[in-house]
């Protein structure tokens, strides 16, 4: 019995040491990749990306539609699965197409991560430093040279930034987009944008179309059909992952103003709480904190009355 316990203990120690060695190897390779990228980026011109202020003001002034690209959309372009969306050939093709689009009132947004990263907090800084080191040249190959891109962080400007002093000002600007507008929120079934906070209190009216939290692109045609039943005077806000990028473009082509607003509600919740980490929000699906586990139903009458369609 004693010998068995000793063997188990030795085996556990060996597994621990092996895992540590693997971690050290991965960390060393990552550091080398980042060092190599410091030289690589000296020889390639980064994309031109407008600031958060410039992007928000452009949307307000021009009533522009918006598609936002990030690491998830990039991976899907290259047929890699992400947490809540399986790779799909058509999805990849459409994401590539829209990335290169040249429409006057359709803003294609990129993460502003291809130059100095010192403005970002430690976790996002480390993440983007490694991501760009691995994929910089692939990003540059996918983009259109000379095109003016806008800023994907228009709805993610609390958690990623080291200096959070401008967040209040940015949220004020953001809310001007839907001030006194009839809005349609197309969101995941447990995202519940604006519930429990005042994010959309200045909107004239709110309607909701609920879609599956994961793999929404499988239901794309049904989502598009439901969206097109709305009057074109309404502002359509999208929070359905990478599917929003394509939906925003297709709705724009049909004469709607459609904005991929992404994680804005969760960022706002973290801002209101002055959160230091990516915390769960009660009764809301947070992909990056808990991934929707233990998100219950709610019986808020106002919220339920706003739901006009449910896509399954």
Model feature map: region roles:
Residues 4-8:
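Ser/Thr/Pro-rich, intrinsically disordered low-complexity segments
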Residues 14-200:
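Electropositive, gly/pro-rich neighborhoods at or near active sites that engage anionic ligands
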Residues 246-312:
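C-terminal functional extensions of proteins
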Residues 190-233:
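A mid-sequence, solvent-exposed acidic-amphipathic segment
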């Amino acid at each position: 019995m004693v010998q068995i316990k000793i063997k188990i203990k030795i085996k556990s120690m060996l597994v621990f040491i092996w895992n540590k060695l693997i971690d050290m190897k991965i960390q060393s390779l990552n550091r080398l990749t980042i060092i190599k990228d410091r030289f690589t980026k000296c020889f390639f011109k980064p994309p031109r990306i407008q600031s958060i202020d410039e992007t928000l003001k452009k949307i307000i002034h021009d009533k522009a539609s918006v598609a936002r690209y990030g690491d998830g959309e990039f991976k899907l372009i290259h047929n890699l699965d992400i947490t809540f969306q399986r790779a799909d050939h058509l999805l990849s093709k459409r994401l590539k197409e829209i990335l290169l689009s040249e429409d006057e009132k359709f803003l294609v947004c990129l993460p502003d991560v291809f130059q100095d990263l010192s403005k970002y907090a430690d976790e996002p800084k480390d993440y983007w430093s490694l991501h760009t080191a691995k994929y910089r040249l692939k990003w540059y190959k996918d983009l259109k040279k000379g095109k003016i891109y806008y800023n994907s962080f228009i709805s993610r400007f609390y958690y990623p930034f080291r200096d959070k002093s401008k967040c209040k000002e940015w949220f004020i600007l953001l809310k001007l987009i839907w001030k006194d507008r009839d809005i349609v929120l197309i969101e995941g079934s447990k995202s519940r944008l604006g519930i429990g906070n005042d994010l959309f209190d200045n909107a004239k009216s709110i309607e909701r179309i609920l879609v599956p939290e994961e793999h929404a692109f499988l239901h794309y045609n049904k989502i598009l059909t439901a969206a097109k039943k709305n009057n074109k005077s309404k502002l359509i806000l999208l929070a359905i992952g990478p599917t929003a990028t394509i939906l925003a473009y297709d709705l724009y082509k049909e004469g709607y103003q459609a904005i991929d607003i992404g994680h804005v509600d969760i960022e706002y919740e973290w801002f209101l709480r002055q959160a230091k980490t990516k915390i769960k929000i009660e009764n809301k699906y947070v992909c990056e904190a808990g991934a929707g586990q233990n998100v219950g139903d709610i019986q808020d009458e106002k919220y339920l009355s706003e739901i006009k369609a449910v896509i399954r």
